[in-house]
Amino acid sequence: MEITFLGTSSGVPTRARNVSGVALRLPQRAEAWLFDCGEGTQHQLLRSDLRSSQISRIFITHMHGDHIFGLMGLIASMGLAGTGHPLEIYGPPGLEEYLRACEKYSYMRIGDRLRVHLVKPGLVFEDKEFQVTCLPLKHRVTAFGYRVTEKDRPGRFNLAKAQKLGIPPGPIYGDLKKGKVVTLDDGRKINGSDLCGQPEIGRKMVYCTDTVFCETAVELAQDADVLIHEATFAHKDAEMAFDRLHSTSTMAAQVALLAQVKQLIMTHFSPRYMPGNELTLDDLLAEAQAIFPKTIMAKDFLSYAIPRRKALAKSLH
C-alpha cells in the first residue's frame, strides 16, 4: 500500500500545489483508489508514474469544487481510453446528480461504465482483502472521512512441520492454513494455528478533509498507521478556521494524538502560507510537531509506503 499525493492545496491551485487528490496504490491488485478529484487531477496523474487505467474506485469526501471539479475530465478520458472495467465512485448526496448533469450538458455518454454509490456512516465497501468505512466530519456541507483497513493475513504455513507430524497433503492443508482445528484419520486433533507463523497485521489509512476538529475524526482515525488530515490554517488563524469549519495544524495534531496513530501527514494548505509570507508551512509543521512529533507535510507527488507492523515472532519449530 502506497500513498501518492496529487494535490495538496486548499481551495485553489498554486504554482507548486494542485487542489485535492490522493491516490492509494494497491500493487497486489494492480489497482489504485483515488480520494477526491480536484480540477487538474488527470494532469497530475500524467505527471506521476500512475496510470488512469489503474483507477478502479474513487471516494469523494464532499461536494466543494476543489474536491470534485476534476471528476468529469478524468471520467471522460478513462472512457476514451477504454479501461475495460467499470468505475466505482462513492460519495455524499448530490454526487450522482452532479455527474448526470455534466453528462447531459456536455453530451458525454457515460453509460454503464460508471457506478455511483451514495455513502452513509458505516461500511462503504468490503471484499476479501479490504474494508472501507466512513464517518461524517464537521464542515459547511455534508462531508465524510474515509478509513481503509487491510484485513489481516494468515501467517506462513510451516509445511516441514506438517510433514513431520505425518499430516497427509490435500484439502486438509487449506483448513490448517486458515488456523482451523482438524481431526486426522487416526483421531489426532491438529490446531492449524500451531503450524502457522504470526498473522500479517493489516494496515490502516485514514483520510479526513474538510473538517474542523471533531470527535468523529478521532474515532475514525483510531490506531491508524497513517492519518491524512487537512491543516488549512496555522494556529494563529484558529478563529478563521472555526468560522470556515477547517482545521489548523494543531487541530490535526490533536486528532493524531488522541487517536494514537502511527504517522500524521498534513495536507490541504491555504495559499496564504506560501514562502515569503509572515507565516509559512514550516511554521505549521513546527506547531503540529510540538503536539505530535510523527508529523510530516504533504507535497504534490510525495509518495509514502505504509509500513507493515511488526508482530511478535512465534516459533515454528
Swiss-Prot record:
Native source species: Picosynechococcus sp. (strain ATCC 27264 / PCC 7002 / PR-6)
UniProt keyword terms in alphabetical order: Endonuclease, Hydrolase, Metal-binding, Nuclease, tRNA processing, Zinc
Free-text function comment from the UniProt entry: Zinc phosphodiesterase, which displays some tRNA 3'-processing endonuclease activity. Probably involved in tRNA maturation, by removing a 3'-trailer from precursor tRNA.
Needed co-factor(s): Zn(2+)
Catalytic activity: Endonucleolytic cleavage of RNA, removing extra 3' nucleotides from tRNA precursor, generating 3' termini of tRNAs. A 3'-hydroxy group is left at the tRNA terminus and a 5'-phosphoryl group is left at the trailer molecule
Residues that bind Zn(2+) 2: 66-67, 210, 268
HAMAP family membership: RNase_Z_BN
Cofactor binding note of this UniProt entry: Binds 2 Zn(2+) ions.
Catalytic residues identified in the record: 66 (proton acceptor)
Top-level EC class as recorded in UniProt: hydrolase
GO molecular function ontology, one term from the record: 3'-tRNA processing endoribonuclease activity
PANTHER family in UniProt: ZINC PHOSPHODIESTERASE ELAC PROTEIN 1
Gene3D superfamilies: Ribonuclease Z/Hydroxyacylglutathione hydrolase-like (3.60.15.10)
Name of protein: Ribonuclease Z
Binding site for Zn(2+) 1: 62, 64, 139, 210
Family classification: Belongs to the RNase Z family.
EC number(s) per entry: 3.1.26.11
InterPro entries linked to this entry: Metallo-B-lactamas, RibonucZ/Hydroxyglut_hydro, RNase_Z/BN
Subunit composition and interactions: Homodimer.
